[in-house]
A protein has these predicted regions:
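Amphipathic alpha-helical linker/stalk segments
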Residues: 70-97
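Amphipathic alpha-helical interaction segments
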Residues: 21, 42, 63, 96, ...
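Generic hydrophobic, amphipathic alpha-helix propensity
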Residues: 15-26, 43, 68-80
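Short amphipathic alpha-helical elements of helix-turn-helix/winged-helix folds
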Residues: 25-29, 108
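C-terminal peripheral helix-coil segments that are non-catalytic and often amphipathic
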Residues: 1-6, 144-152, 163-214
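Short, flexible helix-adjacent loops and helix caps
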Residues: 31-35, 81-89, 121-124, 151-158, ...
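Amphipathic alpha-helical packing segments from all-alpha helical-bundle domains
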Residues: 77-82, 96, 107-114, 118-121, ...
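Helix-turn-helix
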Residues: 21, 29-63, 67
């Protein structure tokens, strides 16, 4: 295990299966606990593996969070690519694309709430450069594609600066969804069901652009 990489990549299918079990178990535990509260012994016990198997793949507990981080962003980029193809965005209206994007973000943050809460806390409190680099890479992968598709419908946008409106409106929608899903449990008076959160976030973006709902 090199100094540069605290995660030992599995070389065999069995080793990959064990690693996936550890990551899946850790992600499930993080839905109920913070990363500081999570313990290696708890993870391996629930994963049905051993402490030795854990340290054979991860240098320490921090490496586990890094692996969860890397897996999330790999899935995020893959899922976004599939979304565009499956929903045929080349032939959809601007409002449909925005609603699809809001649903996608809500599903991503619902599916990985515990992991993303832990990653965001670590990035904020410890200035984790690796997380920030992967977050920027995911953003640079997603946003330009979305921007291009939305600006193909610039004639529908009545905001005086369509480019600015798309950039600002998307960030507004993205960060609103993230904050509600990661920290909403701390604000009992501001909780919404997932469908409402998705629909209202999309409607706010569409309204800001000055686009008529289609």
């Amino acid at each position: 295990m090199s100094k540069q990489n605290p995660i030992r990549e599995p070389q065999q299918a069995r080793s990959q299966k064990t690693m996936n079990q550890i990551l899946d178990t850790a992600a499930a535990i993080l839905e109920q606990k913070t990363f500081d509260q999570l313990t290696v012994s708890e993870v391996v016990h629930q994963a049905g593996t051993s402490v030795g198997a854990f340290y054979g793949r991860f240098r320490n507990k921090e490496a586990l969070l890094q692996a969860l981080d890397e897996r999330f962003f790999q899935r995020f980029e893959q899922d976004f690519e599939e979304l565009q193809l499956e929903l045929d965005w080349d032939n959809q209206t601007i409002t449909t694309i925005i609603h699809d994007t809001a649903k996608f973000l809500v599903e991503v943050y619902r599916r990985d709430t515990g992991v993303l809460r832990s990653l965001n806390l670590k990035a904020r409190l410890s200035d984790d450069s690796q997380f920030k680099a992967r977050e920027k890479n995911a953003w640079d992968t997603m946003y330009p594609q979305l921007q291009r598709r939305l600006l193909q419908h610039a004639a529908c946008i009545t905001h005086q600066d369509p480019g600015l409106a798309v950039r600002f409106g998307f960030r507004q929608m993205f960060f609103s969804i993230r904050e509600f899903l990661l920290w909403g449990s701390l604000r009992e008076n501001f909780r919404y069901d997932l469908e409402t959160l998705s629909n209202e976030s999309a409607r706010a973006f569409i309204s800001y652009l000055g686009v008529e709902e289609q």
